C-alpha cells in the first residue's frame, strides 16, 4: 500500500516528514483517533519506510521491493515488534512486555527493543490496543519510555488521550488522526468488494460508519445494522423504558455467542452507538453547522423529527 492510499492522514505524514528531515524523530509516539480509521496501517507504513533497505532521497518513501519492506509487510521483520490485545483477553498481558515468569526481562517488547538491530538501523515496536494497557503493563514500560534504547521507536495506538494512563501520555508525542469522510469510507468499501444486500447498501454503511471503516464492516452484518437503528429509535422516544432498553442491549450482546470477549465488543459497540446518537442530538438542538459528508442522514432526520423546532 502506498502513502496516497492511506486516506485523510496527510497532516500526520507531513509531520513525520518534517521530523525526519530535521533529524528530530522522537522515540515514543501515541497515535489517537477513532477505531478503524487507519492508525495501525499508518504505523506499519512508517515502520516500512524506516526499515527500507533501498537507497533513495525520500526517507518516508519505501521501495516496497527490498527484503526489509517485504518483511514488514509480512510482519516478520526481526527489527519490528508487534504487540496487541489477544482476542479473548480484556487487557494486554504483562508477558507481552517482560516475558513470562520463567523468562522475566529476557523476553517481551522491553527486552526485544533493547537489542541491537538485526537488519535495519532501527528497532520499532508498535503497541496496538493501547487503551487496554493496565497500570502493571504501563509500569513495565517506564524504563523503556524514560531511557529509550538508541535507534528505537515506540508507537502506541489508542482511541483517545483520556483512555491512556498518565505515565504514557506524559512521555509520548501525541499524533491525532481524524475520522474518515463518508465518501472515503464508501471508496474503501467499494474497493474491498464489500457485498451489498437488499436491506443495506454501501451508502448506508458509509453514512452509518461515523468515519470508521471497521464500524462500516461490522454494520454489514444485518443484525448489527438493525440493532443500531432500533437503539436510535428507543433513544429518540425521550423516555425509553429501562427494562426494554436494557433487554435490547443485552440480547444484542448475548447473540454474539458464548465468548465473553465477543459480548464485550458488542457492549462497547452499543455504547459507541449511543454516543453517536447524543452527539447528533446536540448538533440538532444547537443547530450547529456540520460537513454534510460527516452526517448520517437517517440519524439526522430522526433527531430533527423528534427534537428539532
Model regions: which residues?
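Loop/turn-to-beta-strand initiation segments
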Residues: 120-124, 149-155
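"Short basic amphipathic alpha-helical interaction patches in structured regions
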Residues: 96-97, 142, 169
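Charged, glycine-rich active-site and insertion segments that engage polyanionic ligands
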Residues: 1-49, 57-60, 150-152, 159-273, ...
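Short, structurally constrained coil/turn elements
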Residues: 74-76, 148, 168
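Clamp-loader machinery-focused feature within the broader ASCE/P-loop NTPase space
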Residues: 2-136, 302
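Conserved catalytic/switch belt of AAA+ P-loop NTPases
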Residues: 139-153
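A short beta-strand motif that forms part of the nucleic acid-binding face
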Residues: 87, 145, 223
